[in-house]
A protein has these predicted regions:
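Canonical Rossmann dinucleotide-binding motif of NAD(H)/NADP(H)-dependent dehydrogenases/reductases
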Residues: 2-38
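Hydrophobic positions on the long internal alpha-helix
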Residues: 93, 129-133, 137, 178-179, ...
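C-terminal helical subdomain
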Residues: 173, 188, 195-196, 207-245
């Protein structure tokens, strides 16, 4: 059922790579907005532990599901689970990502196997999820897709980085391109697609010296995930402000 405003009476969100870090905080903030949230992790035990941790903090409405976005079989399986349990998906946050570039590697001497592995998760994983769930969103004439990108994927950064983090930077630049293409394709469907740079956040990936908390890093993804009908689409954001690609 749909409210007159166009919002679903009870929204359902899925956040990839969300048993820890920014993804975990995104799940928490969405659930606190009374949204049913699917917390996903590659390991079911890790996901279940994360849900128990949220429950201890009084955060409910969170369901754990196992997901490996680098596997089409796994993506097909979770699509089936979501359709069976909820019948729809309103919000997709593509948060899962890996950073496996070595610090001394540049574009000219990159290990292409590392590039392939990184693209498989950071780009193709998000693409698989979009392909799987966009039909559900279009059927309900409602969807919000948030691609968690990085400043490392922005052209201005790459022009001054000296070729560092080549696999990761390329994967995030490609994710930005996917964001633009999907937003263009889905205009007029009420499925909004945006990218976001969460900044340098204190997580396992960002390290303890990072300047931002997970709460700060999750704020803009959650804002984009809950945009009203007619909201912006096809843009890149940092702290709720549009930034260049």
């Amino acid at each position: 059922m749909r409210e007159k405003s166009g919002y679903m009476k009870q929204q359902v969100a899925l956040v990839t790579g969300s048993n820890r870090g920014i993804g975990f905080e995104i799940v928490k903030q969405l659930a606190m907005k009374k949204i049913d949230v699917i917390l996903t992790s590659r390991n079911s035990a890790s996901g279940e532990a994360a849900v128990r941790k949220l429950a201890k903090d009084g955060v409910k409405k969170v369901v754990p599901m196992e997901l490996d976005i680098s596997s089409q079989v796994s993506v097909d399986r979770i699509l089936e689970e979501v359709e069976k349990s909820f019948g729809r998906l309103d919000i997709l946050v593509n948060n899962a990502a890996i950073l496996i570039d070595k610090d001394d590697v540049t574009a000219s001497n990159a290990d292409l196997e590392t590039v392939k592995i990184t693209l498989e998760t950071n780009l193709l994983g998000a693409w698989r999820m979009c392909k799987a769930f966009i039909p559900l969103m279009k059927n309900n004439s409602f969807g919000r897709i948030v691609n968690v990108s990085s400043g490392a994927g922005e052209f201005e950064y790459m022009a001054t980085s000296g070729g560092l983090w080549p696999a990761y930077s390329l994967s995030k630049a490609s994710l930005n391109a996917l964001t633009v293409m999907l937003a263009s394709e889905l205009k007029g469907t009420n499925v909004l697609v945006n990218a976001v740079c969460p900044g340098w956040v204190r997580t396992d990936m960002g390290g303890k010296n990072a300047t931002r908390s997970v709460e700060d890093g999750a704020a803009t993804p959650v804002w984009l995930a809950t945009l009203p009908d007619g909201g912006p689409t096809g843009y890149n954001y940092y702290d709720k402000q549009q930034v260049s690609w």
